From Swiss-Prot:
Name of the protein in its database record: Non-structural protein NS-S
Any single Pfam family the record assigns to this protein: Tospov_NS-S_N
Annotated function: Forms filamentous inclusion bodies.
Similarity section: Belongs to the tospovirus NS-S protein family.
Amino acid sequence: MSSAMYETIIKSKSSIWGTTSSGKAVVDSYWIHDQSSGKKLVEAQLYSDSRSKTSFCYTGKVGFLPTEEKEIIVRCFVPIFDDIDLNFSFSGNVVEILVRSNTTNTNGVKHQGHLKVLSSQLLRMLEEQIAVPEITSRFGLKESDIFPPNNFIEAANKGSLSCVKEVLFDVKYSNNQSMGKVSVLSPTRSVHEWLYTLKPVFNQSQTNNRTVNTLAVKSLAMSATSDLMSDTHSFVRLNNNKPFKISLWMRIPKIMKSNTYSRFFTLSDESSPKEYYISIQCLPNHNNVETVIEYNFDQSNLFLNQLLLAVIHKIEMNFSDLKEPYNVIHDMSYPQRIVHSLLEIHTELAQTVCDSVQQDMIVFTINEPDLKPKKFELGKKTLNYSEDGYGRKYFLSQTLKSLPRNSQTMSYLDSIQMPDWKFDYAAGEIKISPRSEDVLKAISKLDLN
């Protein structure tokens, strides 16, 4: 894609900056460089909002990898997830991890950038603020590692943002630890590595909510140049020339099946073999209708002194078996409002029959009972319901019958919070109970029916 196209994308993203309906939504971008060489170790872009939380930790300290026999990977497809898209891509000296989810919409979301330097030793105390030339000399960074291209800054300004290149940067340091929204799980901390954070100092006397620093524009540029879609939840690009361990934690507001997966392997195309270890753990929380996913990814060079050559072919590992469309921009609450309205109508009709027969009415089941059709006359209307061999009554919806018959569907329906529904997860049923005569008389007087 040409530079002009990137400029157009950045201008477009800048024009809708902060227009998302979710005030807590933010896209955090990270660039971590090696202090000894100045080379980029990792760049990451993470989405978070009031319910979605994402964090990661990167370290060059790789522990012991498993001792079992390694597989040789040419291509890998393991359908662990059917609700998110998870893909690992190995190409040349770069590894990319991409996670996409239809609970994510980055359109109109504000961006934040974080520039960091990883060091295996504690450097002598730095001043609280340093200029760009000192950053390049002390940390070996190029100016292009610090700022986005000038034409990208100009494109952002044309899109209604206000950005001017900074002269000074605040410098802070800490032990290497988790970055992002670390409330997902307990943060990881390494006492053997240090992170230096370089934060731009605004170079403008007057600021407003459209004033941004250059790292925010650099984050917009990463979205454009990496061709990240609006449903991108997490994106990580790793330098594959050095050993590393990266842990990524995500909390996604949907129920996915509990799962664990691990694999120890090498790639078939690598001229300088490396060992890789991937572990994935998926932990659903039915009470909060969310799932925590943890990925651990380790790489260890087998021949550290050998010249590293590029992989000619791209090798991918895909862990998704999606059955839902992506790249559809929409109001995330709109589908749920439609479902809620349909269920209200279904429940209202079921409640009418339930009150008349004065018996619990099952409105959804993941089972397949043997049912006999029954009818109920309501004035000039005839309502159909069913009865099983035990005399239990059913008022089932053809729409709900099309849903998967599993506990995830039960959890999803539970999240819609229909007030009269009673959930029996053990039996795999949702039912309603008949209202008392006093309640029905009161409703009749209020003319609520």
